[in-house]
Every structure is written in structure tokens, then in C-alpha cells.
Regions:
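Redox-cofactor-proximal catalytic regions of oxidoreductases
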Residues: 1
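C-terminal flanking tails of non-heme Fe-dependent oxygenases
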Residues: 4-194
């Protein structure tokens, strides 16, 4: 055990949650809703901090070897701190994969599926993937900003109209996350052929 590690990570978690709250306030301003809308929905958040290691590719011809296949994140927003190895790609509005190179002192901010539901796709989830770097280990520290488990996820005020009705049924944070996990890991429940 590293001396002071737990204290350091607990503080980092709190700092990341505070940064997430600041970004969520900016979203409320952009959407024209009450500025403290998210505050009461993030009193006991289920946000997650992960540490991810991506092993290196060993040959230039294994470019299709991915550290993480194309996906969107489940929650509200994701704050990603990358190391200098690179490998993160995002899909642009034309469907092209573009590099999201690490920039020292910055975070990548991805919109997640829960925010897309809340905003009725005014904010859309960010499709992304990781291509393992050639000959270099890659490390990242994503922070998944998630509300209280019982928070109702439904179309925000002003994000729907007669001509643009709500695209998604109402749910709760817990119900939505559990359904996404169940879909993602369905293969683990399927009987294995012998």
C-alpha cells in the first residue's frame, strides 16, 4: 500500500466531482434552465473514478487492435485525463474518426447517454474508442459524473416542443445504468458452449 494514496484519491474524487458540477452548471446556462437544477440531483452521486491500463500494440500492422472498441459512455459527462501516449479517437459529425491528442493540463469532456436523454439530444453522446499505441503502455483516469441513483432522468424543461417531443421515456439514474450494464454484459449470462 502506498502511503497517503487513499487520502490523495479521495481528494481527487471530490475535486473531479466539483469540476463536473461546474461543467453541469454551464450546461444549465446553455439550456436556459435553472442554474441549480443539477445541484440537488448530485447530493449523493454515484460517480465513478477509474484507472485504465491499455497494453501496447507490438506491430505496426496490428493497427486494428483496439484498447477499447467504439462506444458511448452511459452517464452525464465523462472527464478524462490522458497520459502522453495518445490513442483516443472521437467520431465527428461526419462519422469520421479523429485523434483526440492529449494536451497537458487539460481534460477531455465527453457527453454521455444520460445527458443526451436529459437534453433530448440537444447534447449528443460522444462516440469514442481507444487504439492501443505502438510499443507504449497507455494509462487514463476517466471520471464518470453520475447523479444520485434515484434521480429522475426525463426531458429537461425547454428541450422538447410540439414539433420535437421527448425522444426517450423517463427513467431513474439507477434503472438506466443497470439496464446499460445488463446490455453490455449480456454475454456473461449466456450459457457457454462446451
Amino acid at each position: 500500500e502506498l502511503d497517503g494514496w487513499q487520502t490523495l484519491m479521495e481528494q481527487h474524487y471530490l475535486d473531479m466531482q466539483a469540476l463536473g458540477q461546474t461543467l453541469l452548471q454551464a450546461i444549465t446556462v446553455a439550456l436556459g434552465i435553472e442554474r441549480d437544477f443539477f445541484d440537488k440531483r448530485f447530493i449523493e452521486p454515484v460517480s465513478v473514478l477509474r484507472f485504465i491500463h491499455y497494453p501496447p500494440r507490438h506491430t505496426a500492422t496490428s493497427a486494428e487492435q483496439q484498447g477499447a472498441g467504439a462506444h458511448t459512455d452511459y452517464g452525464c459527462i465523462t472527464l478524462l485525463h490522458q497520459d502522453s501516449a495518445g490513442g483516443l479517437q472521437v467520431r465527428d459529425v461526419r462519422g469520421q474518426w479523429i485523434d483526440a491528442p492529449p494536451i497537458e493540463g487539460t481534460f477531455v469532456v465527453n457527453i454521455g447517454d444520460m445527458m443526451a436523454r436529459w437534453s433530448n439530444d440537444r447534447y449528443v453522446s460522444t462516440p469514442h474508442r481507444v487504439i492501443s499505441p505502438l510499443g507504449v503502455d497507455r494509462y487514463s483516469m476517466p471520471f464518470f459524473v453520475e447523479p444520485n441513483p434515484d434521480t429522475r432522468i426525463e426531458c429537461l424543461p425547454g428541450c422538447q416542443s410540439e414539433s420535437q417531443p421527448a425522444l426517450y421515456p423517463a427513467t431513474t439514474c439507477a434503472e438506466f445504468l443497470l439496464s446499460r450494464f445488463a446490455d453490455t454484459y449480456a454475454y456473461r449470462r449466456e450459457p457457454q458452449a462446451s
